[in-house]
A protein has these predicted regions:
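Claisen-condensing/thiolase-fold acyl-transfer catalytic domains that form or cleave C-C bonds
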Residues: 1-117
Length: 118
């Protein structure tokens, strides 16, 4: 359950709010842990592991963090989104999180921004 506590800290340190995050990549060591994080943080399910989590893609022991970062970065670039929060659960309830930003983000072509301009 560590990501439920690590994600808000990382997001706050980045000067953002949970609403600013376009996608959350949360390691799915266990389904119950990810469901808890979604409910505890009040996240929209469509913004969490949209390409499938470790249960669907596999749990690459020893390289979970790398897989999460690459998946999040690819999602941001492919969908012209700006921010992702990436988080790992660690044994005994600990967690780690980071926020990444798409350096190629173009707000003029972002669907949500375009709608907001109308």
């Amino acid at each position: 359950i560590g990501p439920a506590f690590a994600i808000p800290v990382a997001v706050r340190k980045a000067g953002l709010s949970l609403d600013d995050i376009d996608v959350f990549e949360i390691n799915e060591a266990f389904a119950a842990q990810t469901v808890f994080c979604i409910k505890f943080l009040g996240l929209r399910e469509d913004r969490v592991n949209p390409l499938g989590g470790a249960i669907a893609l596999g749990h690459p022991l020893g390289s979970s963090g790398a897989r999460l970062l690459v998946t999040a970065a690819n999602f941001l670039q492919a969908n012209n989104k700006r921010y992702a929060a990436v988080s790992l659960c660690v044994g005994t309830g600990m967690g780690a999180a980071a926020v990444i930003e798409n350096p190629h983000y173009d707000p003029s072509t972002d669907e949500a921004t375009s709608r907001a301009k109308l």
